[in-house]
From Swiss-Prot:
Induction: By mitomycin C and UV irradiation which requires RecA. HEAT repeats lie at residues 173-211. It comes from Bacillus subtilis (strain 168). SUPFAM superfamilies: ARM repeat. This is Uncharacterized protein YhaZ. The gene is yhaZ.
């Protein structure tokens, strides 16, 4: 899989120059390229490349913000997805003093890419005013704008600027999410679930309040609530498990937990297997956890879901899973004793140690 930063390549730069010149014939290509400084391009991250383009546009477009914004609004429809986040980034960097024009531009840009990161400084500047705007966007006809209402207000948006006030008190976000609880777009519903999951990490009582009000009212809301509870479910929260019908696992026996190999080299995979038996009909959520050794020798547990299923009285089910120990950009592996645990309905049923070397 190609590195995401390669989206910002020479072809994109050429296309950007072409489309900007179509709207602004006086655009100085040479000055733009000089300020872009492509000689160190390979070393730059995705965000650094995007920001370099944003700054170079600022140095080359008209200094009047509204005039430059008009050119960018003409250009933006030609750039979809991550390639288009440079346009909201321009607003984020240079548009805070031009609230009305910037908000209209972000509404437009998000329909081709996403303005979720660019709205964060506006929340920091005037949270009450921006929350009101996000609430208005929650009723927009375009699903990308409705998603922006939720995604932009997430207390813990990945890659996004932190909003300390919403981390401390996320309740202002709830009216926005309530507008979207039955949204017809899965794209929007995923964002709502992610927002509520963010909230649950520090304010689980607020998620419970939403669940009490909405769970069981519509298939869309049930889907949102279930996905919003994923962190609490992984933590084995008893109230969360009970909400979805997972009772205690006293009647479940787990047998023959084994893993191969017992000594695993970084880059290889661990295979483990076990079987379960139930003394009664029951709904089960089966997970496994690995206590990974970290860089300084401390351990950090990560929980992975295996399945959610029903098991009948006197039924036996077997499971085999493979866990890769190949280094990823999101996880680096270290040598040492690791622990594998199997969890059923929030209860650890068995564990074993293995060596990573």
């Amino acid at each position: 899989m190609a590195d995401l930063k390669e989206i910002y390549n020479e072809e994109l730069i050429s296309q950007l120059i072409h489309h900007v010149r179509s709207s602004y014939p006086d655009f100085n290509k040479n000055r733009f390229l000089d300020t872009l400084r492509l000689e160190d391009w390979p070393e730059l991250t995705l965000k650094e490349r995007m920001r370099r383009v944003t700054v170079s546009l600022y140095e080359t477009l008209p200094k009047q913000y509204v005039e430059a914004l008009t050119i960018l609004r003409d250009t933006a429809p030609h750039f979809k997805g991550l390639s288009g986040i440079l346009f909201p980034d321009y607003v984020e960097q240079y548009g805070l003093a031009h609230w009305e024009e910037s908000i209209k531009a972000l509404e437009s840009f998000t329909q081709y890419s996403t303005s979720e990161f660019a709205v964060r400084p506006f929340l920091l500047l005037d949270q009450e005013k921006m929350i009101a705007q996000l609430l208005a966007w929650s009723e927009h006809k375009n699903e990308h704008v409705r998603r922006l209402a939720s995604e932009g207000s997430r207390p813990r948006l990945p890659w996004g600027k932190s909003i300390p006030a919403l981390k401390s008190d996320p309740s202002p976000v709830l009216p926005i999410l309530e507008k979207l609880m039955q949204d017809e777009s899965l794209y929007v519903r995923k964002s709502v679930a992610n927002n509520l999951n963010d909230i649950s990490k520090t304010h689980p009582h607020l998620l419970r309040k939403v669940a009490d009000q909405w769970y069981g009212t519509h298939p869309h809301t049930d889907w949102i609530i279930k996905h919003a509870y994923r962190t609490l479910l992984k933590k084995g929260d008893k109230q969360a498990l009970a909400l979805f019908g997972y009772e205690n696992a006293d009647s479940i026996q787990l047998h023959d937990l084994t893993c191969q190999p017992k000594r695993i080299v970084i880059g290889e995979s661990l295979e483990f297997s076990f079987y379960i038996h139930s003394d009664r009909d029951q709904k089960v959520r089966i997970e496994y956890a690995i206590d990974f050794v970290k860089a300084r020798g401390q351990r950090h547990q990560k929980v992975f879901k295996i399945t959610e299923t029903n098991i009948r009285k006197n039924e036996t089910k077997s499971y085999t899973r493979i866990q890769s120990f190949k280094d990823l950009t999101t996880r680096k592996h270290y040598k040492g004793i690791h622990t594998l645990s199997v969890i059923i309905n929030g209860e650890v049923k068995d564990s074993l140690d293995f060596q990573v070397c």
